[in-house]
Amino acid sequence: MTASPYVLLDDSLTPGGRSLLYTEPERVVSAHEPGEVEAALDAISAGLARGLHAAGFFSYELGLCLEPKLEGLLPAGRRVPLLWIGLFRAPRPLDDAGTRAWLETNGAAERAKISDLHLSWSREQYAQAFNAVEDYIAAGDVYQINLTLKYHFAFEGNPVALYAALRRKQRVAHGALIGTPDLNVLSLSPELFFRREGKHMSARPMKGTAPRGRTPREDARLKTWLAMDEKQRAENLMIVDLLRNDLGRVAKIGSVEVTDLFTVETYRSVHQMTSGIEAELRSDMGLKDMLRALFPCGSVTGAPKMRAMEIISELEGDARGVYTGAIGYIAPSGDAEFNVAIRTVVLDKNGGEMGIGGGIVADSNAHDEWAET
């Protein structure tokens, strides 16, 4: 936790690095209850109209508040705000060397210790939830559910040191480090939720995973397997169709296009299947319109989205928080970029948590899904 809030949006994957550092906000906008959301979004829009830059996070549960039919599903005992956005004068661009220097200045070499690591569910509890998902799929309620649980742990030391250590092990294009007086958010997300440049919108959902091989030959085989596996392709295509529909709610008619399907991206520990979608935004679309149409990302709910979110609330029980929400920025011009907040740690005075999970479809296997999770 920190007295002076900051947001580091960290692309450590692009050669040379490409990060944005936001410090000393003029104002912090947050919402903890559904009744506060509308005013908070208006305050963000007003700040942008004044030439300020917005950066921070939207929690997964914000999506429940944006849809009247789902608001009653909001879980009690939430640890983080529904949204936390700082309004800043302008970000400081950093290359990789500059980012590492800033991290070092703020405690990257200090102590960071995790202990008492444990899952929120037992294997038996996961199996019960998995079977319930399969029943819903068999009944025709949904085609896919993204079922998640959490690691909880004790933490001692400097959150910046933990982020720096994780960053060294996993280079990603959509990382983030957020410091507030009440919590820290550390995200090593490889997944782009959406990017807006002028009226151009792009999204890159990620669905489908394979481990890296122990040898170059095994690694190539696993990458080829992921690219060709029918189950992985089917899961990916479901989410592509969902996001095409979501983008269509804010896009010019006929402008939504799939740029590529089933592209495999390679990271240090896994191969990931991604696809690309682009669209041209209608001129009358503002922040609220975009969030109501797109949030949360379909890759972390399942399809169809609204019914999937109802089932997630029933089976998971606990709030996801920042995990599977979105972290990013909005410029005064309206340009914006947000990640899907996967591979994300939240630290507060009570310790830390990290959500994990995966998509379940009709032919999923409980043993395999538990092992992957």
Question: At which residue positions do the language-model features occur?
Answer:
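Extended alpha-helical targeting/anchoring segments
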Residues: 1-372
